[in-house]
Amino acid sequence: ETPAVTSDSEELQNTLQKLQKYGTVTITYRFGDNIEVLDGSTISTWLEVDGFAVTLDQTQVENYVATLRKKYDSIFRSRTFMTSYGKEITVDGGDYGWWMNYQQEAKELAAQIETGESGERTPVYYQTAASYGAPDYGDTYVEINLTAQHLFFYKDGQLVMESDFVSGNSARGYDTPEGTYSITYKQRNATLVGENYETPVSYWMPFNKNIGMHDATWRSSFGGTIYKTKGSHGCINMPYEKAQELYGYIEKGTPVICYHLAGTERSTESELEK
């Protein structure tokens, strides 16, 4: 009796070729110093064979990418931060960090596996950060101490500038939120519009929705405890020259770290030179 399928059957050969093709694929992901290698031994467990048809189980691909996302995404996570005051703190909140578009990445990864093409992949991201690993914000960032009403700008780990400021009015519930954010964009000569105000500013640097840093030429003093009763609607009000200087250094994506630190309160405020 002649077998239904012989070893030289074209259909069988095609099936074996497909299985071999999947089995030789090696895809490498680099997350800083960490390397994740996906090879044929894993991919072969994602294959479904029905008769001569070989299909890649998309759910298995999605599950794999989801484990990468869980391991390497840093958005919405707490961060350890060494302040300019020599104290290490934990900063919660904010929307800064690596954020993988895992569904899109799973589609593109599956498509690459289907072609049988080995190589290195960079995941598809909704949002990237400065660095893999800790700290993901890197060494260029704006540090905002809401307790001291004082900010610092570091570039490549070096302090470049600092300034007093006035943040959100505590008495009216406009406290500037803590958290790790990034500069959304920067704009010259913007008009800030709220429910009951319309304010033109020369240097606008938003980082948390409608909260940002800007010059406040209507103020003659900054720092101290002004914010407690005469603060802003949430923005970081800066002296004109300091806002101008910071504007020249920062760019879209520059991390902004806001925190409170007990023991750094300052009762005195800085007066602008007349």
Where are these regions (language model features)?
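Active-site scaffold segments
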Residues: 204-258
